[in-house]
A protein has these predicted regions:
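N-terminal, active-site-proximal structural segment of metallo-dependent hydrolase catalytic domains
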Residues: 2-7, 15-106, 117-120, 319, ...
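Active-site-proximal beta-strand elements of phosphoester/diester hydrolases
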Residues: 37-49, 135-137, 161-171, 178, ...
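Active-site beta-strand/loop signature of hydrolases that rely on acidic residues for catalysis
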Residues: 38-45, 63-91, 126, 153, ...
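Active-site environment of divalent metal-dependent phosphoester hydrolases
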Residues: 49-50, 79-83, 118-122, 172-175, ...
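Extracytoplasmic/secreted proteins, especially bacterial periplasmic and envelope-associated proteins
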Residues: 55, 59-63, 95-102, 121, ...
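Structured beta-strand-rich core segments of catalytic domains in phosphoester-bond hydrolases
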Residues: 75-172
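Metal-dependent phosphoester-hydrolase catalytic domains
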Residues: 136, 209-220, 226-330
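Active-site-proximal segments of metal-dependent phosphoesterases and phosphodiesterases across multiple
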Residues: 169-202, 226-245
């Protein structure tokens, strides 16, 4: 109880301070009267917000409400492990993802949907507005299995139809679907990077790639890409041919998408992990990008410090940092 009280006090202080949520000190723009604005939260919440499930998600709900988002995209939206343990929850006893309808209502979202769900790490989208599930993407064995699934959703806000694509690509250094005896060789040949390229190609071809006018439609593709971008090479100093750049080079060169964080923070490097790696991204189509007035990686009272749980190896509150976007609806 004391821990929760202190958390609530910190959230209140954050609100009074203007939600200063990054080392840059930039804050979300206050909505004007002329045009409505929406906020979008994107976060890999690590095993269905494992760090707060023993607290009935009270800190998580309080934190989400403090940003008053209109749309949320959550990666790893399934409860996988028992509270404070690295012990799997028995099948059928997982609160999430089926409990998202109840949980989302606690922070003001009456609508939710799930992307393609083929393993323990699906994505979920929640919203103040009705959600149309266009496609649940899992790929196929003959072409490309999308390891953690993906989703294409449409939400109409203030008369504007918005396309949302959620994803979470393969995390390992070796390729998906190979035997344990082949993993070392696959790792040596950057198999994981090439597999993530197959996944992102499949996802884009089956979403924005099907649009007749993607430049002028509103598209947002976001999630945990498990890949680094050549736009951040001022930090990494890799060879430009490095296979770790394959995923984002494809997005930047073969689609109309624009890297939102890079666009709003030219010359800066904003890690989205506890280390020095930006692997969580939000991409917008040109028409939507022109209306993004704020974007940042959140570092606030709750997510500012990522703490390793020594007993399990998991992180608290997550091993990733959230992204926050604000978009003007005009």
């Amino acid at each position: 109880m004391k821990r929760r009280f202190l958390f609530c006090v910190m959230v209140a202080m954050m609100a009074v301070a203007g939600c200063d949520n990054s080392k840059s000190g930039k804050t979300p723009v206050t909505p004007s009267v002329k045009y409505p604005k929406i906020r979008i939260l994107i976060w890999n919440i690590q095993n269905g917000m494992w760090a707060d499930q023993g607290n009935d998600y009270d800190n998580f709900v309080t934190w989400v409400k403090s940003y008053d988002p209109d749309v949320c995209i959550w990666c790893e939206a399934k409860s996988n492990y028992k509270t404070d343990l690295k012990q799997s929850i028995p099948s059928g006893q997982n609160y999430l993802p089926d409990g998202w309808g109840e949980l989302a209502k606690r922070y003001g979202h009456d609508n939710w949907s799930k992307g393609g769900h083929r393993d323990n790490f699906p994505q979920v989208i929640t919203s103040k507005y009705p959600i149309e599930t266009v496609q649940k993407i899992i790929g196929n064995q003959a072409d490309t299995v999308v390891s953690h699934g993906a989703g294409h959703f449409r939400i109409t806000i203030e008369g504007k139809e918005m396309n949302f694509v959620s994803l979470h690509t393969w995390p390992q250094k070796y390729a998906f679907g190979i035997s344990s005896s082949e993993q070392a060789n696959s790792t040596a040949n950057n198999g994981g990077d090439y597999y993530r390229l197959k996944e992102i190609t499949y996802i884009c071809e089956h979403t924005i790639g099907k649009s007749a006018d993607p430049q002028n439609e509103w598209w947002l593709m976001a999630g945990d890409f498990n890949a680094q971008s050549s736009l951040d090479n001022h930090k990494y100093n890799y060879a430009l041919s490095d296979t770790r750049f394959l995923v984002h080079d494809y997005v930047l060169e073969e689609t109309p998408y624009i890297d939102v964080i890079n666009e709003k923070h030219k010359g800066e490097f904003l890690s989205t992990t506890s280390g020095t790696s930006r692997i969580d991204f939000a991409y917008c189509s040109p028409a939507m990008m022109g209306n993004v007035i704020y974007a940042d990686v959140i570092k606030d009272w709750w997510v500012g410090s990522i703490i390793k749980d020594e007993a399990t190896g998991f992180k608290r509150p997550s091993d990733h940092r959230p992204l926050l976007l604000q978009v003007i609806m005009k």
